Each structure stands twice: as C-alpha cells, then as structure tokens.
C-alpha cells in the first residue's frame, strides 16, 4: 500500500505573488486532506515566477523535510522536458518534423520503418512502444547497444495508422535521433544539459550525476502493480488489465526491462544515473515550470523559433485510424513529444494551445502560450490516475479558474 503520513501545518515553504493566493490555498488543502507526503508546485507567467511552493516530507519514513532545493523524479513528465531538446534541434535546422527518421539515422529503416517521419515518431504513431529483445540495465547504459536494438525493432502496427503511448521507448528513440543530428554527437541528456539547462540555469537532469547528494532527492512512495486493481475507479480498467497481462502490448510497453515498470525502483541510484528520457528525469519542480515558461513566452533564451513554437502549439495531426490509444486503451492525443488538450483531459486556457506531459503518480507540467504560463507540479506519494490527479487538478483549477479566469480544467462531462 502507498505510504500515508500526517504532515504538520507548518511544514511549508515558498511564496506566491499578489493575486495568486488561491494556488497556495489549494496546495495547503492537498496536505490537509492527507493526500500528500511531500510536493512542490511552481508557476511562471510572462517570464516571472509567480508561484513557488514546497512542503511536507521528502522522505515520509524518516520525516526528512522537503526543502527549497529538493529534487524529485517526475517519471513521464520527463518526456515533455526532454522534447525541448528536439525543439531546439528543430529550430537550428538540425531536423525537420516531417522528414523521415531514416534520413538522419539510416539504420532505423530496418524492419519496415523506412517511411516513419519524425512527427509520427514523436507523436506515438510509429508502432514502437515495445522492444522485443530482452534488455538488462547494463544495456541501457550503452547508447550504441540501444541504437542497435532500436533500429532492429519492427512496428507492432502500421505507422501513422494508429497511436499508442510509447511509455519508455520514446525517450530512447529521441535520444538516438539527437545523437545523429547533433554535430557534436551528444546524448540527449548531455545536449539538454548544455543547450537547455545551462542557458536557463536549471537543475534538472536526464541521467542524474553522481555528485548530486542523496540528501537532496525525494524518496518516491509508490505501489506494486497488483494494487492498481483496488483503484479501478481512478485508473482505467482496460489499462489495468492490460498492464497486468504479460501477453498485452500494454504490459510489454512498460516491461522491458521489468525493473522500469515498478515505481519504487526509481529510488535506485543505478537507475537514476542512466539516460531514460521518457521516464527518469530528476530535478527541482520550479525549474520544470521555468523551462515551460520559456516556451510559453517566445523561447528567446533557447533560440527557439516562432515556426517551432507554432508547431508545438498547433493542433495535433491524428493517426488515420482514430484516437483510441493501443497501449493506454482509451482516447488520447499526442503531438511532437507532448500531450495536447482533449475532451477527457483539458488543461491550459480554452484556446487549446497548451502542451505538456503528465507523469506516473500524479506529476504534470505544461506550457500555455495563450496565458504565458509555465506550470509544474510533482510529488513523492504516488496516486493512481493516468492524468488529472485530484491534487494537481486542484492546483491547476485554482490557477486557471480562480486566478486567471481562463478556462475550465475539468474533463468534458459529455465524453
């Protein structure tokens, strides 16, 4: 069972700008309800930090406090942060979203992938959510070995016809694509560190350096997969049955190596030091919000062009076979490394320009060009929603409905 502890009322830090008090109230309410152990939330608007909150325990078993510089692993919220590296590469003319992946990575054309475009790959349409060759952790440490394995993989559906969440594999494909187009041949983690984190002054890592002290890391309090069966009111039933069925695409998408499919394993340093750009990004929550805030306000410090930013904000190009996600087993919409708003998951303003990615357990971060907002929330007590964790929705609703009056954050009840 997921750990539950009582957090004292005085275990909070940070501040908000005038007018953003409802977000602070929502943050405290999450703790008062007993839903949190430790968490942080930050918001940038028009380039300025307007919300920066943290509280509770970074480790619920030892009662060590979550502090201003605490870092937390954000699971698939990593995907959106990692995809900023692809946006930088696109702006520099290193890749074209509508070019074939094999143009940059010839070996990728093996096994029927020759016509897959970068857009299809980044939008979870390439049919590559699984890896058939059994992997070990040591394989993940070798970028050359992973490139060979990824190039050999055959799609499990006709690319472009369907889509399905590439829960783990997306980041590895992005990583090899960056290695191929970057003149310096850097890994995605290093490219991100040099070209995104450094210019913005971020403490966020895709591949945690060994010199980051353990005392700065939040401990994830997760659950074992069978526990999902007790939360079918929160987690979609079809997803749960697929995740627990070794024959299903859903199981295979998160099960190679199996260590990556268990939330608590992301407390292991040997896993965090690897580059898993779809899953193991670790950093300060305010820095995630800062990065998205940069995208929401023009991307000047990263040299991101208006053409790239328009591509990210524009409506997704859906697969020809509809929006049913083969892996998640419900409708979803992806575009260029991000999730876009859709009736079952409405975020950002009613203009629909926002883009971001949620992570296992409840984290979520996004950019909203319409309001100039970069938003991020992460926690260490795992919840059971694929998205719209009630704790995160409470914060986002306080921001968009109470402060900005910019649109409902609740799903369309008719869907």
List where the protein language model places each region:
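Active-site-proximal alpha-helical segments within enzyme catalytic domains
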Residues: 124, 169-177, 275, 279-301, ...
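Short, gly/Ser/Thr-rich active-site loops of penicillin-recognizing serine hydrolases
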Residues: 276, 297-300, 308, 313-324, ...
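A short acidic/small-residue loop/turn micro-motif
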Residues: 57-59, 381-384
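Active-site-proximal loop and beta-strand segments within enzyme catalytic domains
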Residues: 5-6, 60-169, 176, 259-261
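Alpha-helical scaffold elements that line and support the substrate/ligand-binding pocket
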Residues: 43, 47-48, 73-95, 121, ...
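Short, conserved catalytic-motif segment at the N-terminal edge
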Residues: 13-74, 96-99, 152
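Active-site Gly/Thr loop motif
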Residues: 222-285, 314-370, 406-410, 414-415
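Active-site helix/loop module of the DD-peptidase/beta-lactamase fold
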Residues: 68, 76-77, 91-133, 151-152, ...
